[in-house]
Amino acid sequence: MAGIGTGGTIMGTGRRLKVYNPDIQIIGVQPAYPFHGIEGLKHIESSIKPGIFDETFLDRTIFVETEPAYEMTKRLAREEGILAGQSCGAALHAALELAKELEEGVIVVIFPDGGEKYLTTAPYKDL
């Protein structure tokens, strides 16, 4: 599971993982709305699609609203000591929602971005 920004991380990592295990599911995370505050992620339907991105490769896409992404980013910092970007908060929120649907399995979430460059922005300014 990874956020969809340029598409490079989810496409490259996903393709390589499928070589090792064709049954693995590749799940993308993107903002629920065109106008959002989740840095690093694209709302694909309203954006110019990056050339590397192939929507048909994904097994599923989970849409996340801005506030839950911000809240999860704050929780990562407060509870786990992980300074991550908002796209990471969105991806973790989506993973936890997915986990509620599963009886068993393993969910791997890619955190591609640190939070140091966002310290003066939401969600960190409220910490």
Give the ranges of each region predicted by the language model.
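Short beta-strand segments
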Residues: 2-5, 28-30, 108-112
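Glycine-rich ThDP/TPP pyrophosphate-binding loop and its adjacent helix/strand module
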Residues: 1-24, 100
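Phosphate-binding loop/pocket of nucleotide- and phosphate-handling active sites
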Residues: 96-127
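Surface-exposed, flexible loop/turn segments at secondary-structure boundaries
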Residues: 8, 34, 69, 115-116
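Active-site/ligand-binding loops adjacent to catalytic centers
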Residues: 18-86, 101, 122-127
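Conserved acidic residues
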Residues: 1, 59, 105
